[in-house]
A protein has these predicted regions:
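Class I SAM-dependent methyltransferase Rossmann-like catalytic core
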Residues: 1-44
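Conserved class I S-adenosyl-L-methionine
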Residues: 49-58
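Class I SAM-dependent methyltransferase SAM/SAH-binding core
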Residues: 58-104
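A conserved beta-strand element that flanks and buttresses the S-adenosyl-L-methionine
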Residues: 116
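Short catalytic micro-motifs in class I SAM-dependent methyltransferases
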Residues: 119-120
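A short, conserved alpha-helix within the catalytic core of class I
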Residues: 123-134
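Conserved beta-strand signature within the Rossmann-like core of class I S-adenosyl-L-methionine
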Residues: 138-149
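Short alpha-helix
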Residues: 156-177
Length: 199
């Protein structure tokens, strides 16, 4: 894969922003709870003293469900300032640092404990580059991503299981779309990769 150009990426962000405008807040709650159950995590208890990076968190990122129990929380969200100010405030109120830039362009000079990709890699400059950066800089990488073979304005990339296995090896499972009411209709790849298992 090679990066899409910046103009194409920006148009994808605009289209994705429009999609989020149509979602009810309850949809984010269902998504976060379902992802947490599938990955076997307790948001409030499992991340104390951890440095967490959530990529493309949207207006109601999963990190909000930690209620600030992390050591350091970072959200990389290029759209954050397009939403009403209270969205930014919700993150800042629990101590989350917000970065308004593409994840691929970050210089991460410390190893973080966790990097999360939940429904984001279809919208980025380069999915492989993002995953490789996370692998290099994170002790744990958590993934829940829709699989798709078509592209559109908001989704410039197709996503297959091989996108993840080519970077991390076979670490995940397939979620069958439509099996949880109010949640993903598409099949998804999910799992947790541990650097300690791959040394």
């Amino acid at each position: 894969m090679s990066r899409i150009d910046l103009h194409r990426w920006q148009s994808a962000q605009t289209a994705e922003f429009g999609h989020h405008q149509d979602l009810r807040m309850s949809a984010y709650s269902i998504a976060t709870k379902t992802i947490g159950n599938l990955l076997g995590i307790d948001y409030e208890k499992d991340f104390k003293d951890k440095v967490i990076v959530e990529v493309g968190a949207g207006p109601r990122g999963s990190i909000l469900y930690t209620k600030g129990t992390f050591k350091r929380g970072i959200v990389v969200e290029p759209l954050i300032d397009r939403w009403p100010p209270e969205i930014r405030k919700d993150y800042e109120d629990i101590g989350v640092e917000l970065i308004v830039a593409p994840y691929e362009d970050l210089e991460i000079d410390e190893q973080v404990d966790e990097t999360w990709f939940f429904n984001v890699v279809q919208h980025v400059l380069d999915p492989t580059e993002q995953l490789e950066l996370a692998k290099k800089t994170s002790k744990v990488v958590r993934v829940f991503e829709g699989l798709c073979q078509t592209t559109d304005q908001a989704h410039p990339w197709t996503v297959s299981e091989e996108l993840f296995t080519n970077v991390f090896g076979d670490f995940g499972k397939i979620f069958k779309g439509g099996t949880v009411e109010g949640f993903h209709s598409a099949d998804c790849y999910y799992g947790t990769w541990y650097a300690s298992d791959n040394v």
